[in-house]
């Protein structure tokens, strides 16, 4: 389910339980609606999973399902409105919906793997689709997170290529930044700085040798990195306890929260003010 937690860590609301297999990306639009991507498909041997996964769901602030993108339980081929392990979702300045589609690109050398941005109208009709698996400009190896900057540019955490890509709203490549390490998630603070979470650089073997997992804070104006919140601990297990912030958010008071994957499950930790 989706959990709403207050500043003291208390769960104050819960919704969406049983609707999703792997709730992955989360976006709250200006109206308070909650968008969630379900980045996994059903296990054919588990009948309880039938018809679930491969979708993006829009919830009202109270948890009512308002819209579904994709077809539940059906994996798309990267060309139409049917999605395939969608990673993340963001609503653009004009109300269009942008989905980072394809979670498996970083784990394969198959160029047919889905790795794209799918653009939908506000009522869920596919408008356009761009990108493919690869490492060139406008190509992706897992578009793991998406969001818009203050200029209306689409920022993509192209995790498998260890970079942020900046695109316009029609998918045209503008620039890239590799100094934010291997990005799993991003958030813009009220100060205009971008906060980028790296959850994988300490894996063994490392997909990003020489880099330390954590949260890098900087500017997309000049690409500078001003601060680093260390997420590493001793050892190089895939999911070491207390490390690897895969999600990041900043509240109005400037507190930084890391969503941490660990052996015991997951947790949210306030890591800096």
Model-derived regions: residue spans:
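Sequence-structural signature of mature extracellular/luminal beta-sheet repeat domains
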Residues: 1-273
């Amino acid at each position: 389910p989706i959990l709403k937690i207050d500043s003291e860590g208390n769960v104050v609301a819960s919704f969406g339980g049983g609707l999703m297999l792997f709730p992955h990306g989360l976006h709250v639009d200006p109206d308070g609606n909650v968008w969630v991507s379900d980045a996994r498909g059903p296990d054919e041997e588990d009948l309880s999973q039938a018809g679930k996964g491969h979708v993006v769901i829009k919830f009202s602030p109270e948890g009512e399902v308002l819209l579904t993108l994709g077809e539940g339980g059906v994996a798309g081929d990267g060309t139409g409105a049917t999605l395939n392990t969608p990673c993340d979702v963001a609503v653009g300045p004009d109300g269009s919906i942008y989905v980072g589609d394809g979670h498996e690109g970083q784990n394969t050398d198959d160029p047919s793997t889905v790795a794209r941005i799918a653009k939908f109208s506000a009522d869920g009709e596919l408008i356009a689709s761009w990108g493919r698996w690869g490492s060139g400009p406008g190509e992706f190896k897992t578009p793991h997170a998406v969001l818009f900057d203050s200029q209306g540019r689409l920022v993509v955490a192209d995790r498998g290529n260890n970079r942020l890509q900046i695109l316009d709203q029609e998918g045209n490549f503008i620039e890239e930044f590799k100094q934010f390490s291997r990005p799993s998630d991003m958030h813009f603070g009220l100060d205009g700085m971008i906060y980028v979470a790296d959850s994988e650089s300490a894996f063994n073997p490392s997909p990003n040798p020489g880099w330390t997992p954590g949260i890098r804070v900087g500017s997309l104006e000049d690409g500078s990195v001003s601060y680093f919140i260390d997420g590493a601990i001793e050892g190089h297990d895939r999911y070491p306890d207390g490390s690897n912030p895969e999600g990041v958010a900043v509240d109005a008071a400037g507190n930084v929260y890391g969503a941490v994957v660990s052996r015991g499950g997951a947790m949210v930790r306030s890591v800096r003010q």
